[in-house]
């Protein structure tokens, strides 16, 4: 598999670029959505939990951002990985290439988006005076591990999704429930 991926590395690079560019292509705000989406989620949770439900946690906003951004990365890449084989069925039927390129490109583009979103975590940590630990050097490694986990689960569920197309919606619901 790795030898074949190496042989098709240009296709993999092109597919990753297509995923990154295609995500915000028709959007007026473009890549800014990498910042806006998590900020809007944080805003909703920051209002609902501490003020309406009475949940009080020190540095709650930083706590919230530190959880929402990695979870959103996992949720998005897993959802897209589950359906990417079925969504590209027309191409798969016509041209041979390693099918694993499709979910790998989804996860890699998600990693790029996640690393951009990590800037929000840094900013919130500095603004709220939490500070930044030297442990931050492990974020890329942890993101890579999280991405590999999403890739593995996404590939397994993607194979099943080819036969049970409702699985995609069940996975979306389950991931929302788990958060």
Locations of regions flagged by a protein language model:
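Hydrophobic transmembrane alpha-helices and immediately adjacent juxtamembrane helices
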Residues: 1-179
């Amino acid at each position: 598999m790795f030898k074949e991926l190496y042989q098709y590395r240009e296709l993999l690079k092109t597919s990753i670029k297509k995923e990154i560019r295609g995500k915000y292509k028709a959007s007026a705000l473009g890549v800014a959505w990498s910042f806006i989406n998590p900020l809007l989620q944080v805003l909703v949770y920051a209002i609902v939990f501490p003020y309406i439900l009475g949940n009080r946690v020190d540095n709650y906003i930083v706590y919230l951002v530190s959880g929402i951004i990695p979870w959103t990365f996992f949720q998005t890449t897993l959802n897209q990985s589950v359906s990417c084989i079925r969504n590209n069925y027309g191409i798969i039927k016509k041209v041979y290439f390693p099918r694993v390129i499709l979910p790998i490109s989804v996860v890699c583009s998600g990693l790029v988006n996640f690393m951009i979103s990590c800037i929000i975590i840094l900013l919130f940590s500095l603004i709220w005076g939490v500070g930044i630990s030297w442990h931050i050097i492990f974020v890329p490694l942890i993101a890579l591990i999280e991405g590999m986990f999403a890739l593995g689960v996404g590939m397994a569920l993607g194979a099943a999704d080819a036969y049970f197309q409702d699985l995609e919606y069940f996975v979306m619901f389950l991931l929302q429930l788990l958060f």
